UniProtKB/Swiss-Prot annotation:
Its main location: membrane. The chain crosses the membrane at residues 22-42, 104-124, 297-317, 406-426, 607-627. It is found in: Cell membrane. One of its GO terms (cellular component) is plasma membrane. Keywords: Cell membrane, Conjugation, Glycoprotein, Membrane, Transmembrane, Transmembrane helix. This is Plasma membrane fusion protein PRM1.
Length: 643
């Protein structure tokens, strides 16, 4: 071959495996492996989900397909028992109201009739007492006074009679003397007439039978006992009938027909939340798979282009380096020729000592580092020693060893940024609208199934309630019509009986009209009010039972479950259709986020390692400073020891 070094074409044959391309390829493989591991993790999640579809469907059917059935059983039992208890309590309340009403009516009748009797008795007894006392006083006065006066007159007239008789005897004698005895009979007749008149006055008296008539009027004052007894007996008849009817009622038979309480059958249609939504689940994972594929293709294209670009750059760099090598060779030959003394036999040994071949090599093969060092040193200082120290520091920091630390640190940080970006993209997809849309569709299907079952059950429950309401209104409150009609008739009869009693007692007297007016004010108006009240009860007595609203019941159930879950621990939460879909979504997202979190932790560790490499690179700066200080101290010490 003639030479032991590599020429340009031989160097270019190895350009594909340069260190920069190798680093790029290693980074590409690392990121591709990272993407592959993420993809495998999500594939495992999808496989696990699909493999457990049967279990998910089983628990879903237990909740959704069976819930309306068991809720219907529970609800029907509660409705039936509540209806029976409501009817029983209603009957008991009605029975109490019947007794209260009867007693109130009896009390009011006693109150009103008692008031009426009191008014009448007070008026009549007072009048009779006054009249009787006045009559007795007059009779006693008349009878006693006339007899006494007659006796006194009779005593007075006896003396007068003697005088008159003596006068009459004298007159009679004179008359007989002159005329004879013709008029003697006239004088005797006049005297006898006087005596007869006084005797008649003695026999004058007021008969005591007038007191008997007043006592009889007082005794005949009406007390309405017959009317009250008759009214109470008439009032008690319908109330007794009602009480007996209420006692004979069986509350369990009064409620509606239990056949209306339909129990939703357990749904065996095979609706499955997981199996029926495999397409949506696959769609979510397909979206994530597309992200992985797109990321893989992007990484491949970018890194392959970068590797090709570095290959081209290194080919150009190799060509430039080959030119510099040839220049270095020519420069070395030129310096050797220029420094060689043709008259000195030892010139071949002295020339290399005047040439710093290592510095020349550095200037040729580290062109950019040396150029940057010269530029930086001239900007910082004009002293030659300081400039050379700065150039040495740049050379130290840009050596292949130091640049290896810098490359590892920067490439590691770059790979971590790429991996973080991939994790962020996948996380956004998982927590994005696609997953939310899938879970919303599943939740809607579950809600529709449960709500339809609740609606069907509420319809059957309302039929049962309708039948119960009809039975109650017909068999319980239907009696009120008969009762109110009977009581109204009794009130009418009571008014007629009172009128008859007043008419019988006072008709044809001056007390009839006042007593009739008093009766109307005291009793008649109240009886008319009772009649009006009974008519109102007759028209309004009915029961209206509330109906079951399936939609409202379902919404309230969901709200109660939500409120209950918000105030209880997670282990005590009650599942509902929304929470099942949410839980499924949360489980999928949680599993995916757990994988992403694990890989994120791995990337964080890689970032820490890369940062350590970068810190080690910057640690070279104080090390270089220490070396410069040591060299300066050594140089100063050597100069002092030099003679």
């Amino acid at each position: 071959m003639g030479h032991i070094y590599l020429k340009l074409n031989e160097r270019l044959s190895q350009i594909w495996c340069n260190k920069y391309t190798i680093i790029i390829l290693v980074m590409m493989v690392k990121i591709l492996l990272f993407i592959k591991m993420l993809s495998n993790g999500f594939e495992n999640i999808m496989d696990y989900t699909m493999e457990n579809c049967r279990n998910i469907d089983y628990y879903y059917s237990k909740y959704v397909n069976s819930s309306p059935h068991y809720m219907g059983l529970m609800g029907n039992f509660l409705i039936q028992k509540s209806m029976e208890q409501s009817v029983a309590l209603s009957l008991k309340s009605i029975s109490l109201l019947v007794s209260v009403s009867e007693n109130v009516i009896d009390f009011m009748i006693d109150l009103w009739l008692g008031t009426w009797v009191c008014l009448i008795v007070s008026a009549i007894d007072g009048s009779v007492d006054v009249a009787t006392n006045a009559t007795e006083s007059v009779i006693d006065l008349v009878n006693g006074t006339v007899s006494s006066v007659a006796d006194e007159i009779d005593d007075g007239l006896s003396g007068l009679t003697k005088v008159v008789n003596k006068v009459l005897s004298a007159v009679n004698d004179i008359q007989n003397f002159f005329k004879g005895n013709d008029d003697e009979s006239d004088i005797n007749d006049q005297v006898k007439k006087v005596n007869l008149t006084i005797n008649g006055l003695r026999t004058l008296s007021i008969p005591s039978s007038i007191d008997d008539k007043l006592v009889k009027l007082s005794a005949n004052t009406p007390d309405f006992d017959t009317v009250k007894n008759k009214t109470k007996q008439a009032i008690a008849v319908p109330f007794d009938i009602i009480r007996n009817e209420i006692k004979s009622i069986n509350a369990s038979k009064l409620v509606g027909d239990p056949q209306y309480l339909e129990v939703p059958a357990i749904d065996t249609s095979g609706v499955k939340i997981c199996s029926d939504n495999k397409s949506e689940i696959n769609e979510v994972f397909d979206t994530i798979r597309k992200v992985f594929n797109a990321s893989t293709m992007t990484i491949l294209i970018v890194f392959i282009l970068a590797a090709l670009s570095l290959i081209v750059y290194n080919a150009w760099a190799e060509w430039r380096q080959w030119i510099r090598l040839k220049r270095f060779r020519d420069q070395y030959r030129h310096q050797t020729i220029m420094l060689k003394n043709p008259f000195d036999d030892m010139a071949d040994e002295k020339v290399p000592q005047n040439v710093d071949i290592l510095e020349t090599y550095h200037l040729v093969f580290n062109r950019y580092q040396s150029g940057f060092g010269r530029w930086l040193s001239r900007r910082i200082s004009s002293k030659l020693e300081t400039q050379r120290n700065i150039q040495w520091l740049v050379t130290y920091l840009t050596s292949s060893t130091s640049l290896t630390l810098l490359a590892l640190g920067l490439c590691g940080i770059l790979m971590c940024c790429v991996q973080f970006a991939i994790i962020a993209i996948i996380s956004n997809k998982i927590n994005g609208k696609e997953t939310e849309k899938m879970m919303t569709s599943m939740s809607t299907a579950m809600n529709d199934t449960v709500q339809q079952g609740m609606t069907d059950w509420s319809k059957s429950a309302n039929l049962y309630i309708n039948d119960t309401e009809t039975q109650i209104n017909r068999q319980v409150f239907g009696w009120i019509q008969n009762t109110t009609d009977t009581v109204n008739g009794t009130v009418t009869d009571l008014i007629e009986d009172i009128d008859n009693a007043i008419s019988k007692a006072f008709n044809g007297t001056i007390l009839y009209k006042p007593m009739d007016t008093v009766m109307q004010c005291v009793i008649g108006n109240k009886l008319e009010a009772i009649s009006t009240a009974l008519t109102w009860v007759h028209n309004t007595a009915q029961v209206n039972l509330p109906r079951v609203n399936g939609s409202e019941l379902y919404q309230q159930l969901q709200q109660n479950l939500t409120d209950s879950n918000s105030t209880t621990s997670s282990t005590a939460e009650l599942p509902n259709s929304t929470s099942i879909a949410t839980q499924l979504k949360d489980n999928l997202i949680s599993a995916a986020n757990k994988i992403l979190s694990q890989y994120k932790n791995t990337v964080v560790i890689e970032l820490i390692v890369s940062s350590v490499f970068l810190a080690l690179y910057f640690f070279q700066i104080p090390v270089a400073g220490i070396i410069l200080a040591a060299q300066k101290h050594k140089s100063k010490h050597n100069n002092q020891n030099r003679p």
